[in-house]
A protein has these predicted regions:
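Extracellular beta-sheet-rich ligand-binding/adhesion modules
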Residues: 1-281
Length: 281
């Protein structure tokens, strides 16, 4: 177990950005199992070669403030299996692309870039990757947004106003905890707890257990069934004409906008306080 710092720049051409070149690391030597890998501002070199490191179970991977290089590409990401990933490049960082295979890890995005149109500052893919805790504070992050990419995420948390998280259809998502920022979800979710920011469900996304709204905005645009919706504040919108069902709805405070021609509410539960309900066209 050792600490490995990415330096880059050894040799010529693509050798300078090759993960597999020993002299691109300090101390010299390609990272092996359990090594901690760090990218710092002292290196401006990207990682564009030697990207298949899937056989190496790394320790922690840290992409620190000031590192402005890119890692992998959308079509050829860095394949690796770290125990954890922490990114804090700020908006100066280039795009970072990772394929974590079926690895189990925690992911913390303190800050990253917002990418160009249609891309993400950090894009994570895999085939059964298991993310226990996913935290996004700032920057644009995509999780398995491509075709045939799959992941399980136990808890996804966005707490920074500049955080933006997108989850693809191949994600199995248990808990969402949002107090700020933006989340767009194309997969089904077990539990949502939102107190700020904007969360939008898309495509066939369902809420299989409950959505609890304390504040912020919840746009339930997905066609899947919402098992339970409890509104203590904030705004809930059912946008578009897609048919969907809410099995149980409780409105204690806040507002709900929906069209009964497309949204079926099976049971309106009794609120826990006096409420005023108004309808507009």
């Amino acid at each position: 177990m050792a600490d490995k710092l990415w330096v880059g720049g050894d040799g010529t051409g693509s050798q300078q950005t090759d993960w597999s070149r020993a002299a691109n690391w300090s101390p010299s030597g390609v990272p092996v199992a359990s090594d901690t890998v760090t990218f710092q501002s002292s290196s401006t070199y990207s990682v564009t070669a030697g990207l298949d490191q899937s056989s190496v179970s790394l320790g922690a991977m840290r992409i620190e403030a000031g590192y402005s290089g890119s890692i992998g590409t959308s079509s050829t990401p860095l394949e690796c299996d770290p125990a954890s990933l922490v990114v804090d490049t700020g908006d100066v960082g280039a795009n970072l692309f990772f394929d974590f295979g079926a690895q189990t890890l925690d992911v913390t995005i303190k800050s990253c870039s917002f990418g160009s149109l249609g891309t993400y500052g950090v894009e994570l893919s895999g085939a059964g990757v298991a993310i226990s805790t996913l935290i996004v504070d700032s920057g644009k992050v995509g999780i398995c947004t491509g075709v045939n990419e799959t992941a399980t995420v136990t808890t996804a948390r966005v707490s920074g106003s500049a955080g933006e998280l997108h989850l693809g259809t191949g994600v199995t998502l248990t808990n969402v905890d949002q107090s700020a920022g933006t989340i767009v979800v194309a997969c089904s979710i077990s539990d949502i707890d939102i107190s700020g920011g904007v969360l939008t469900t898309d495509q066939a996304a369902a809420v299989t257990t409950s959505a609890t709204v304390h504040g912020g905005t919840l746009n339930l645009d997905g066609s899947g069934t919402v098992a339970s919706l409890v509104v203590h504040g904030g705004t809930v919108n059912f946008r578009g004409g897609v048919a969907r069902t809410v099995t149980a709805l409780t409105l204690n405070q806040g507002s709900i906008s929906y069209d009964p021609a497309s949204v079926t509410v099976t049971t309106w539960n009794v609120a826990d306080r006096p409420v005023t309900v108004s309808a507009t066209t």
